[in-house]
Swiss-Prot record:
This is Probable anthranilate synthase component 1. It comes from the Eukaryota. Chorismate binds at G297, T298, Y412, R433, G447, G448, G449. It comes from Schizosaccharomyces pombe (strain 972 / ATCC 24843) (Fission yeast). Component I catalyzes the formation of anthranilate using ammonia rather than glutamine, whereas component II provides glutamine amidotransferase activity. SUPFAM superfamilies: ADC synthase (SSF56322). Pathway: Amino-acid biosynthesis; L-tryptophan biosynthesis; L-tryptophan from chorismate: step 1/5. Mg(2+) binds at E324, E462. Belongs to the anthranilate synthase component I family. The modification Phosphoserine is found at S390, S392, S488. InterPro entries: ADC_synthase, Anth_synth_I-like, Anth_synth_I_N, Anth_synth_I_PabB, Chorismate_C. One of its GO terms (biological process) is L-tryptophan biosynthetic process. Its cofactor is Mg(2+). Keywords: Amino-acid biosynthesis, Aromatic amino acid biosynthesis, Lyase, Magnesium, Metal-binding, Phosphoprotein, Tryptophan biosynthesis.
């Protein structure tokens, strides 16, 4: 297998860019591999690992799947801004551009919980029950990863030449080549170490933390605040907990087929797992441009093409949904313009329909060119959490919803994504349609935007619609494994 770039080219890149980490890679065909199989082969027995995918049509969105594990883990302790440490770590790396690599070839993969807003807006901090007990943020620092190029049906095996004073660059290059060859050997092994799946029982009941009456009370309370002029909009949520005998990776494998989404992810964090199919980009940094995708307004998918189109037309004609959406686009413009040049901030797309497996949404795009005195982390802090999961004005809405929910949201409505070694490389989604698996229980959470004319029953049903795709994935996966057990008995 040929390695790109070669040693001489790496030496030239290191000198030209004053780099201390340079990516190199080899390429193998992907015709006998899938991302799920590659993940299993590469991460057997590892306590921490990840797979990031985009299972949608369109090369610009879904070209690559990324698989890897960390060489070091950054875990938030609940005392200081977790992004500050991540920013310091990434700044220590000076890399160089290498042709032929995907947009992400090394850096950090992880999550930022919704409750980290207290570090960016201290007035939102208040005592809250910590039901799940997860770290506030976690980042996997990764130099070695596998990128599936779905456009060309190849696999790029990536490692980094770590250049250190006193260490010959030839030695560092050979160490990186050795890692690539070890990964190649694992990928080409005929053995697929399937997850250990115990006997699956059906019929476990899902339990809400607030119930139907509790959620409707949230809506009524927030409508009073809207009527009194305290806020324009807010986003309460409910969390459901459900036992399951499924291995969490088996659940992810099925989820990616029944709910293909722009942001698919499975992150294994030792004693808990994050399984997601998010439709919504939070913030992306691309060639100096900051991009945000507000999603607000939801209707179900129809059983027929005609019914599907009727639902979409109703959504586009809904005065309530359009008003709410415009409000959140304005909030997104404000968040983006705080870190971007005002004359470059624009609404690139306004209120288009995007269809997913179980729901349809109104979607817009807001973007701007990052100011020279700002960084991608400033952009993240400005936009986080998204107005679509918090409200408007954002800080007051967060305070009011926290006062009702009285629990930490954890990963729900936070962010999952990747931050490259390059200064302008960041791609994060909102952690919605996301499940947390811990100790044999799956936790799911969903909310909806409340405005002055919201109907309590409609809003409650909307949360159920948003939960449905993941609940269905759990139920269908359980049935599949139960049927396999019965047929082999």
């Amino acid at each position: 297998m040929k390695i790109y770039p070669d040693l001489k080219q790496v030496q030239e890149l290191a000198e030209k860019h004053k780099a201390n980490k340079i990516p190199i890679y080899g390429v193998i065909p992907a015709d006998m591999l899938t991302p799920s199989v590659a993940y299993l082969k590469l991460n057997q027995g590892k306590k921490y690992s990840f797979i990031l995918e985009s299972v949608t049509q369109g090369e610009s969105v879904s070209r690559y799947s990324f698989i890897g594990s960390p060489y070091r883990i950054l875990m938030a302790n609940g005392k200081t801004d977790p992004l500050a440490r991540l920013e310091r770590e990434l700044k220590e790396v000076k890399t160089a551009p290498v042709e032929g690599l995907p947009s992400f070839s090394g850096g950090a993969v992880g999550y930022v919980s919704y409750d980290c807003i207290k570090y960016f807006e201290p007035t939102t901090e208040m005592p809250l029950e910590d039901t799940l007990g997860l770290p506030e943020a976690m980042f996997f620092m990764t130099d070695d990863l596998v990128a599936f190029d779905h456009a060309y049906q190849t696999v790029k095996i990536i490692s980094h030449v770590c250049i250190q004073q006193g260490r010959p660059i030839e030695e560092a290059y050979e160490a990186a080549v050795f890692k690539i060859n070890m990964l190649k050997k694992k990928l080409e092994s005929p053995e697929i170490p399937l997850p250990e799946q115990k006997k699956v029982h059906l019929g476990y009941e899902a339990k809400s933390n607030v119930g139907e009456d509790g959620y409707k009370a949230f809506v009524s309370n927030l409508k009073e605040h809207i009527f009194n002029g305290d806020i324009f909009q807010a986003v309460p949520s409910q969390r459901i907990a459900r036992r399951t005998d499924l291995h969490p990776f088996n659940l992810y494998r099925h989820l990616r087929t029944v709910n293909p989404s722009p942001y698919m992810f499975y992150i294994h964090c030792d004693d808990f797992d994050i399984i997601g199919a998010s439709p919504e980009l939070l913030v992306k940094s691309e060639h100096g441009r900051i991009i945000n995708h507000p999603i607000a307004g939801t209707v179900p998918r129809g059983k027929t093409k005609e019914e599907d189109e009727a639902y979409a037309k109703d959504l586009l004609a809904s005065v309530k949904d359009r008003a709410e959406h415009v409000m959140l686009v304005d909030l997104a413009r404000n968040d983006v313009s705080r870190v971007c040049d005002l004359d470059t901030t624009s609404v690139d797309k306004l209120m288009t329909i995007e269809k997913f497996s179980h729901v349809q949404h109104l979607v817009s795009q807001v973007s701007g060119v990052l100011r020279p005195d700002k960084t991608r982390f400033d952009a993240f802090r400005s936009i986080f959490p998204a107005g679509t999961v918090s409200g408007s004005p954002k800080v007051r809405a967060i305070q009011l919803v926290y006062g009702l929910e009285k629990e930490k949201r954890g990963i729900y409505a936070g962010a999952v994504g990747r931050w490259g070694y390059e200064d302008d490389n960041m791609d994060t989604c909102i952690a919605i349609r996301t499940m947390v698996y811990k100790d044999g229980t799956v936790y799911l959470q969903a909310g909806g935007g409340i405005v002055f004319d919201s109907d309590e029953q409609d809003e409650y049903v909307e949360t159920l619609n948003k939960l449905r795709s993941n609940v269905t994935a759990i139920e269908e996966t359980e049935k599949l494994y139960a049927e396999e057990e019965n047929s082999s008995a």
